[in-house]
Structures are given as structure tokens and as C-alpha cells.
Amino acid sequence: MTYPQKIDSTGCSPKYTIDCIEVFGIRKILGDAQKVVEVPDRNFLPGKGFFMALSNHAYDFEDLHPIDIVEDIATHQEWQFDRIADDQISMEMAGQWRSYSITLAWCAGDQTLSLICSFEMDPPAHRIPALYEALNAVNDMSWAGGFTYWGAERLMAYRYGLILSNGQMAMPDQIDTMISAAVTSAERYYPAFQMVTWGEKDLEMALKVAIAEAYSHA
């Protein structure tokens, strides 16, 4: 299994958080994109409490590194992961719709823990404008984090940054929630993205499906 190479996070310039492919080393981890246009019955959507936080783990918070916590969570959940560098880790996780590549990186200079959850998406060229319209609508509905589409790499990515200050530490429950929220959002809105692209459905219908899914699993 090939994982992203080590990156240099020194300085944490805007490029560190914006140039997603080069900096976080997000990989294509799937084959041909699934062309799902309908939403099958399913009983699973990860949500609050789906990922077990390591609240009872004995941590030395004085010397705690947030990526160490992520590694503990990945080990506890038996996810495939690679500790690319002291400040970066990459994981793979299987969802109901897709498999996801999740990368977390710590920028000490900005005191920010950044997360990117990506999955492959290769919509028809003539439906790209509809996809961007859907992205705008979905991001308006999202309280934390947001989606962006990297056309050249054919990847959809959910991005979120946990900003800390004054030497605050990222707690296990916070990191656990970051990962859970990323996968939950990807699972929730994947059908809507597929409906407006391969299904060529209108945006309103696609969003109703996503909202209905969210309420059915609340």
C-alpha cells in the first residue's frame, strides 16, 4: 500500500492549507466511480457517538501531540493508517457509499489541526456546473467544514480545521468528533452529488434526499 510522502509543515503558509493535493498528499483510493442515481434502503449513517472516543485512555497532556491521539484512535478502530510524519497521518475508512481517505495534519505555527476527507468522483463533463451549484447549496447548509471539488484529480474533499490558541490541546473527543463529522457529511451528501451529476436530477430533489436521510438517522 502506497501512502503520501512526508511533507514539510514548517511555517504553515496558506499554501499548506490550500494546496490540498501536494501538501496533504491525498490519494485516489478507488477504481471507477460508482454511478449511483438512486438511494437504496440502508440502516447505517455514522453520527455522534459512532466513533468511540478514547476518553478513558491515560494521556500525558503536558507533552501530548494531536497526531498521537489520532494514531491511538485509528489503532483502536483498527483502521489502516500511515504516520507519514510527526505532524501528519493518513487513514483509510470504509463507509456505506464509498471508501474515504482521511488525512490530518498539525500546524504548530497556526495552532490548527486540519482534516481532509476525500473520495473519488468523476462526474460527466456537462454536469460539472450542476455539481458546483450543489456544492454551494450543501456548504450553505453545513455549520462546520465544507466540500470542494478538485477537478484535475477527480476528487471530492471535505475540509475542516480545528483552531486552538494559547497552548490549548486538542482533546480526544474533539478529534473523534472531527473524524465522525467528516464521514457523516460525506455519507449524507454523496447521494445528492450523484443525483445531480449522473442522475441529472434537479438540485431541490437531490437536497431533499440528503435531508430526509439525515432525519431518518437522527
Residue map of PLM features:
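Short, Lys/Arg-enriched N-terminal segments with co-localized hydrophobic residues
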Residues: 28, 33-51
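Ser/Thr-rich, low-complexity intrinsically disordered terminal regions
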Residues: 72, 76-120
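Long, amphipathic alpha-helical coupling/dimerization segments that relay conformational signals between
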Residues: 157-193
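Short, highly charged C-terminal tails/helix-capping segments
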Residues: 194-218
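Short, internal acidic amphipathic alpha-helical interface segments
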Residues: 119-155
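Terminal, regulation- and interaction-focused segments at domain boundaries
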Residues: 43, 48-72, 118-121
